[in-house]
């Protein structure tokens, strides 16, 4: 039913993702409901700032707390997705130590640290892949 609504209205949804970097590697997660790698993140709730949504999703999905000041906006993009327009802010944070990642095995079923050169060869959510490629170009 929602897909029919999306096809007719083409609403804009808002999301926030966080690329976690440590020791030259990036954390990729696999969600139970999509066939590709992504980063911790999700929908921005009505009235919520994207940065706060990113912080909330980090705790919910991988049990990690960082401060708002540690997040840097890496990429902001709007693209068609499942009959709607998805506006996504991708943040990144450089971690000094490798954190313990707690996967809930419901929404997030896998978390792996990989070199960015490897990440861009994997089936990664396209806007996220663009942010990783941008990071490589610096």
Each language-model region and where it sits:
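A generic fold-level signal
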Residues: 11-13, 21, 83-85, 106, ...
């Amino acid at each position: 039913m929602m897909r029919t609504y999306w096809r007719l209205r083409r609403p804009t949804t808002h999301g926030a993702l966080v690329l976690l970097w440590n020791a030259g590697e990036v954390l990729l997660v696999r969600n139970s409901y999509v066939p590709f790698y992504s980063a911790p993140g999700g929908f921005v709730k009505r009235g919520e700032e994207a940065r706060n949504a990113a912080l909330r999703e980090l705790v919910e999905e991988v049990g990690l707390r960082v401060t708002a000041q540690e997040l840097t906006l890496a990429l902001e993009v709007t693209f068609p997705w499942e009959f709607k327009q998805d506006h996504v802010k991708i943040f990144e944070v450089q971690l000094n130590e490798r954190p313990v990642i707690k996967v809930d095995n419901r929404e997030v079923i896998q978390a792996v640290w990989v070199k960015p050169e490897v990440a861009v060869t994997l089936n990664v959510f396209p806007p996220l892949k663009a942010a990783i490629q941008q990071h490589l170009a610096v």
